[in-house]
Structure formats: structure tokens, C-alpha cells
Regions:
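A short glycine-rich, Lys/Arg-flanked "PGG" loop and its adjoining helix->strand segment in the class I
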Residues: 131-146
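Conserved Class I S-adenosyl-L-methionine
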Residues: 191-275
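Short alpha-helix
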Residues: 173-189
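Class I SAM-dependent methyltransferase Rossmann-like catalytic core
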Residues: 1-41
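Short helix-loop-beta connector
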Residues: 42-48
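A short SAM/SAH-binding and catalytic strip from SAM-dependent methyltransferases
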Residues: 116-130
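Class I SAM-dependent methyltransferase SAM/SAH-binding core
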Residues: 50-108
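Conserved class I S-adenosyl-L-methionine
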Residues: 146-173
Length: 275
């Protein structure tokens, strides 16, 4: 993720908050990530974590609560291009470690084997150079190490809504999808796993709520889409005074293995640094 990601959240923070409030996406992601974390960090080791595209740190905080890692063992770095979100994330996440949380607007180039865990939760949609971004992330992944990412695919109900709106505008769909991640990982020669994650989006059916969700999905292109098209896009999901959508996306898992002797000890945990 760079400072010029293809979607800017400054004008849609309230709409994004509305989505988070009315969806079970975060809970579903946390449940699905949990089994992959077993054995990642042992009690006498340090663990260096990068959250790539952390937003305001809300999901990261839930992730760290679930992990139950010892604070003194955690070294945390976040990448977030939005300055407001970045400040909020540092304030929220500092409570999870006595070590200063490092915050970057973009991933520095040429990082190598800096992190035992890298999380990219629903952020790779906005990467201008997806293959280059993934290459940089995976170069930063240590051995042993774990990379976890969440991405919606082309059949995702929200992605289909957005695609229909861009079709109306005569514009190509500007965001990456799970299918693009699969192709990028394959072209990089990465051995990865993938699994489906299901969640619900349910909110009271009111015009203002349909418009809010449309604004979240379309970002700066929202005003160009006819209002009636935004409203009509949610009509198939309207029932008994609610909009109810069953949504599915994918998790991608890259795991690096090596013998115990290759792990860093907790006595002198190396801080991520730029090379």
C-alpha cells in the first residue's frame, strides 16, 4: 500500500463505520485467522508483527486481544497511508506492547525477513502494483513466518454491486480482487493456501442507509452514479424492513517453515529496520 492507494477514506469514514457496525465481517475474519496462529509465537520468543493497511487499528486491536500474546514479546509496526487513521491506530495499539509502535505511511523498500507475522486484512484491493506490493510484503516475511490476507472475489455481493455502478459510469473496475491475488502469488512462485470466509451484512432498510453503503463502496465515484441506481442496487436484498446480504470472501495464507534454531531469541528482539 502506498500513500496514493486507489481509494481514499477521508470522506467516507462515517460510511465505513456504518459498514463495520452492521456486518459480521470482523468477527468472521478473526475466527478464521485463529487456527493459523497456533504455534506461531512461543512463550520464550519475541514476535514481530506488521499490520499492512491497519486503518484506525480497530481490527488489529481485536486481533491482538484474541492472540493473547505477552505484551513484552510483541514488536508492532503498522502501515497506513491515511494520516488520521495512522495516528488513531498508534494511540489504540500502544497499549498492547511496551515497545514503541512504529507507524509508516507506506512499506519501505528492500525490507528483508523483518516480521514473523504480516497481516493484510481487506487492504490489497487498493494496491496500484499488486504483484510488487506482495513481493515487498513477502520479502519482509521472516522464516519461520506467517502471512495472512483477506480479499473479496468477483462473485462477492458487494464487489458485484460496485462493478455494476462502474459499468453505469463506463469505467473499468478499479480495485483488485481475490482472483488478482491468486494470480500474483502464483506468478511470484509462492506456495499458499486459500479458504472461504462467510459473513452477513444486515442494516435497516432506509434510503439514507442504502446511500451510505453505496458511498462506502464507490468512494470518490459515488456522486457520479445516478442516485436511483445506488438505491436499486440494494433492492434484491430488501426483506421485512432490512437489507440482508450473505457475503463471502477469501483468506490467503503463506507459511514459512524452518528449524527451531533459526528463530530469534527473546533476549534481543531485532526491531524491523529499513535496509
Amino acid at each position: 500500500m502506498s500513500e496514493t492507494s486507489s481509494k481514499h477514506f477521508g470522506s467516507i469514514r462515517d460510511d465505513y463505520a456504518f459498514f463495520l457496525q452492521h456486518s459480521t465481517e470482523a468477527e468472521a475474519d478473526l475466527r478464521a485467522y485463529a487456527p493459523h496462529l497456533h504455534g506461531l509465537a512461543m512463550e520464550d520468543e519475541s514476535y514481530r508483527m506488521l499490520d499492512f493497511g491497519c486503518g484506525d487499528g480497530g481490527f488489529t486491536a481485536k486481533f491482538l486481544v484474541q492472540s493473547q500474546w505477552l505484551p513484552e514479546r510483541l514488536w508492532l509496526v503498522i502501515v497506513e497511508p491515511d494520516a488520521t487513521y495512522r495516528r488513531q491506530a498508534v494511540d489504540r495499539l500502544q497499549a498492547f506492547t511496551p515497545h514503541p509502535v512504529q507507524a509508516w505511511p507506506a512499506l519501505p523498500p528492500h525490507l528483508k525477513a523483518c516480521f514473523e507475522l504480516i497481516l493484510a486484512n481487506h487492504v490489497l484491493y487498493y494496491a496500484h502494483d499488486l504483484k510488487g506490493t506482495l513481493s515487498g510484503i513477502l520479502h519482509a516475511l521472516a522464516t519461520p513466518g506467517l502471512f495472512l490476507a483477506a480479499m473479496a472475489g468477483r462473485t462477492n455481493a458487494l464487489a458485484q454491486f460496485s462493478r455494476q455502478c462502474f459499468d453505469i459510469l463506463g469505467k473499468p473496475f478499479p480495485f483488485m480482487t481475490a482472483e488478482d491475488v491468486e494470480m500474483a502469488l502464483a506468478s511470484l512462485g509462492e506456495d499458499y493456501g486459500a479458504e472461504k470466509v462467510h459473513y452477513e451484512l444486515i442494516f435497516p432498510d432506509a434510503e439514507e442507509h442504502r446511500l451510505s453503503m453505496g458511498r462506502f463502496l464507490m468512494g470518490s465515484d459515488f456522486d457520479a452514479v445516478p442516485r436511483r441506481a445506488i438505491l436499486a442496487g440494494f433492492e434484491p436484498y430488501s426483506n421485512a424492513g432490512e437489507i440482508a446480504m450473505q457475503v463471502v470472501h477469501k483468506h490467503f495464507i503463506v507459511r514459512r517453515h524452518m528449524p527451531w534454531q533459526g528463530r530469534h531469541s527473546a533476549a534481543s528482539p531485532p526491531r524491523p529496520r529499513q535496509h
